[in-house]
């Protein structure tokens, strides 16, 4: 039997974190290609450090001449991302950074398997959902994201001009009878404007927004606060630490509350099952929980490169299932085509909807009118209930 009383911790990082900046650039490149051609192939990696952003990887369009034209857009894409995030500091400014572009055409050997609707690579992918939040996400990661998203809003609006883009949050929540009831500790580190600002000064800025975001009653007199615990945090972003695409895969998913197959998302077009099948797994797990078939659901799928159908489907309802897990496994396979093409079509993934996923979580977000976060819909519940 799983534990019911415990403390669990998850962290998030802001859009200005060096790794997240790289995720944003990689997904912005992807969106640019998909806006031109829904079948574009992109595997874009980004590296950022003091005064420099390097972009590389494989891309493909049906028209080679158009591909060459798109390569010339990369410099502007990078600068637009850095500007939107808010970096205008001396050693990392969107106007003055050096941008190096090493993107090249996708390997024909990879393309030949994918063009036949096979998976773009082998691998395992996990989806998860639970009833801890209205979004059916684990509470520690969901609220860690919410804190940083709120701080970014007030920074960008000019409401809090002393905040800067680079930030991290971490919440330790106490669970009672399997439900989150109290914040045991809050860790918040944020880049700020002036060296003379103390940890207390920064806490005075951020605390009202943290209290606004967290459920009423969760913060108590016993809650520990650690705001900028090392003191000054003026030098930040890629000028403070180098960044790489795909280094925040736990932040991107469930905050450690569920397994992860190891594949990153950002910069990958939806033929890559690292991304699309992980989205499908979340979609299915969320619909299982939304349908009332379980309070918690972990779902795994696996693929082989060039092979269309998943090799396996595994479901664990952690003792909360209303029906046997094997029945749910059969039902999800019956209700959704889990070939790479089937996933792309069911979730309408071949569109420029990815830059927005690059910070504050790929899951637990509201489905959007243009198809963004389509994997967060709960429109499969009736079909699942009929199938079991």
From Swiss-Prot:
GO terms for biological process: one-carbon metabolic process; S-adenosylmethionine biosynthetic process. Binds 2 divalent ions per subunit. HAMAP family: S_AdoMet_synth1. Mg(2+) binds at residue 19. Catalyzes the formation of S-adenosylmethionine (AdoMet) from methionine and ATP. The overall synthetic reaction is composed of two sequential steps, AdoMet formation and the subsequent tripolyphosphate hydrolysis which occurs prior to release of AdoMet from the enzyme. Belongs to the AdoMet synthase family. Residues 106-116 are annotated as: Flexible loop. Its EC number is 2.5.1.6. It holds the Pfam family S-AdoMet_synt_C. The gene is metK. L-methionine binds at residues 58, 106, 241, 272. Pathway: Amino-acid biosynthesis; S-adenosyl-L-methionine biosynthesis; S-adenosyl-L-methionine from L-methionine: step 1/1. It is found in: Cytoplasm. InterPro entries: ADOMET_SYNTHASE_CS, S-AdoMet_synt_C, S-AdoMet_synt_central, S-AdoMet_synt_N, S-AdoMet_synthetase, S-AdoMet_synthetase_sfam. SUPFAM superfamilies: S-adenosylmethionine synthetase (SSF55973). It catalyses: L-methionine + ATP + H2O = S-adenosyl-L-methionine + phosphate + diphosphate. This is S-adenosylmethionine synthase. Homotetramer; dimer of dimers. The keyword Cytoplasm applies. Its cofactor is Mg(2+); K(+). Keywords: ATP-binding, Cytoplasm, Magnesium, Metal-binding, Nucleotide-binding, One-carbon metabolism, Potassium, Transferase. ATP binds at residues 17, 166-168, 241, 247-248, 264, 268. K(+) binds at residue 45. It is an enzyme of class 2 (transferase).
């Amino acid at each position: 039997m799983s534990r019911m009383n415990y403390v669990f911790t998850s962290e998030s990082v802001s859009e200005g974190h060096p790794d997240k900046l790289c995720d944003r650039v990689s997904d912005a490149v992807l969106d640019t290609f998909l806006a031109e051609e829904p079948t574009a192939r992109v595997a874009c990696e980004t590296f950022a450090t003091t005064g420099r952003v390097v972009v590389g990887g494989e891309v493909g369009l049906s028209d080679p001449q158009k591909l060459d034209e798109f390569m010339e857009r990369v410099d502007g894409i990078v600068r637009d991302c850095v500007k939107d995030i808010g970096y205008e500091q001396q050693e990392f400014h969107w106007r003055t950074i050096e941008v190096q572009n090493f993107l090249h055409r996708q390997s024909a050997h990879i393309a030949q398997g994918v063009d036949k609707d096979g998976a773009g690579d082998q691998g395992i992918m996990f989806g998860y959902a639970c009833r801890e939040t209205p979004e059916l996400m684990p509470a520690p990661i969901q609220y860690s994201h919410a804190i940083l998203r709120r701080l970014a809003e007030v920074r960008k609006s000019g409401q809090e001009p002393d905040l800067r883009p680079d930030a991290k949050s971490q919440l330790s929540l106490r669970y009672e009878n399997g439900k989150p009831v109290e914040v045991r500790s809050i860790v918040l580190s944020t880049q700020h404007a002036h060296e003379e600002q103390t940890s207390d000064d920064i806490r005075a800025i951020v605390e009202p927004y943290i209290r606004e975001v967290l459920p009423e009653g969760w913060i108590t007199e016993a809650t520990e606060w650690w705001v900028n615990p090392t003191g000054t945090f003026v030098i930040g972003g890629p000028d403070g630490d180098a960044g790489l695409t795909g280094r925040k895969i736990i932040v991107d998913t469930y905050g450690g509350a569920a397994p992860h197959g190891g594949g990153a998302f950002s910069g990958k077009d939806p033929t890559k099952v690292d991304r699309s099948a992980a989205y499908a797994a979340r979609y299915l797990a969320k619909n299982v929980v939304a349908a009332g078939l379980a309070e918690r659901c972990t779902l795994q799928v696996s693929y082989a490169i060039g092979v269309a159908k998943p090799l396996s489907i595994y479901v664990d309802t952690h003792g909360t299932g209303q029906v046997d897990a094997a029945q749910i496994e059969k039902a999800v396979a019956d209700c959704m085509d889990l070939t790479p093409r089937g996933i792309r079509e069911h979730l309408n993934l071949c569109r420029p909807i990815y830059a927005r996923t690059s910070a504050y979580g790929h899951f637990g977000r509201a489905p959007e009118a243009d198809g963004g976060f389509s994997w967060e819909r709960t429109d499969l519940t009736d079909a699942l209930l009929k199938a079991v």
